[in-house]
Design a protein with these regions (language model features):
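Residue-level recognition of the N-termini of beta-strands and the immediately preceding loop/turn
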Residues: 18-21, 47, 101-105, 140
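Short, solvent-exposed amphipathic alpha-helical segments in soluble enzyme
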Residues: 38-42, 89-93, 121-122, 158-163
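Glycine-rich phosphate/diphosphate-binding loop of Rossmann-like nucleotide-binding domains
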Residues: 1-78
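Short, acidic Gly/Pro/Ser/Thr-rich loop/turn segments
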Residues: 30-32, 81, 112, 150
Length: 215
């Protein structure tokens, strides 16, 4: 954290307004909240962190000028469908020397997804080599480690277990009642196995899609 705070201060010293600005997309999720907490602990003022989620990204279509106008961009979304890119090569070229953006942290790491909202790089990075440059763009680095939770294994395991355990405890409710899934889908009885109802519905949807395509 000391190195990170030092890096933030270096950025601050080179800014006329003496601010280090960041934009977090997916700010209301677990990763987004963690990113904001990390930024603040690293010396970025909370007021200088733009916190976007579905409301902001739905209000207008990307690419977003606000990204290139920020020092740091952190992508924490869960990508479930095709969306316009958050930032692309054209936006970066248009910004030119006026670009403030210097670092992108792509927590989502959708590099192999055809709907990748950050289509300016194509490789994942590692703890040993955490950054990769953006082709054709000077002074812009991307962190795209697709197993970031392993950096904090205990904390990650505890957080995941905390969220998973309630659903595991609901499983007997489903296993002991063959009509429970149908009932839960109608009643949305969260806390009585509804997560398994949604999982069953999603499985059946994709199974039907696979059969339709000859799988």
């Amino acid at each position: 954290l000391k190195r990170t705070r030092a890096a933030v201060e270096v950025i601050r010293e080179h800014r006329q307004d003496k601010r280090v600005t960041a934009l977090v997309i997916g700010a209301l999720g677990r990763c987004g909240r963690g990113a904001i907490d990390c930024l603040v602990k690293s010396g970025v003022q909370l007021d200088d962190v733009a916190r976007w989620d579905l409301q902001e990204t739905s209000a207008k279509s990307g690419p977003y000028q606000e990204i290139v106008d920020s020092d740091l961009f952190i992508n924490c979304i869960y990508l479930s469908k095709k969306i316009p890119p958050f930032v692309d090569a054209a936006l970066l070229q248009q910004a030119g020397s006026n670009r403030r953006l210097g670092t992108i942290v792509d927590v989502s790491c959708d590099t192999t997804n055809p709907h990748n909202p950050i289509p300016i790089y194509s490789v994942n990075t590692t703890f040993e080599r955490p950054t990769v440059g953006v082709p054709g763009v000077d002074g812009l680095e991307v962190i795209s480690i697709d197993h970031l939770p392993t950096l904090l294994p205990r904390e990650s395991s505890e957080a995941f277990s905390h969220d998973l355990l309630p659903s595991l405890l609901q499983l007997p409710y489903i296993q002991n009642d063959e009509h429970a899934l149908d009932a839960l889908q109608k009643e949305h009885a969260e806390g009585q196995g509804a997560v398994w109802a949604r999982a069953e519905k999603l499985f059946q949807h994709h199974m039907a899609d696979a059969v339709a395509h000859g799988a």
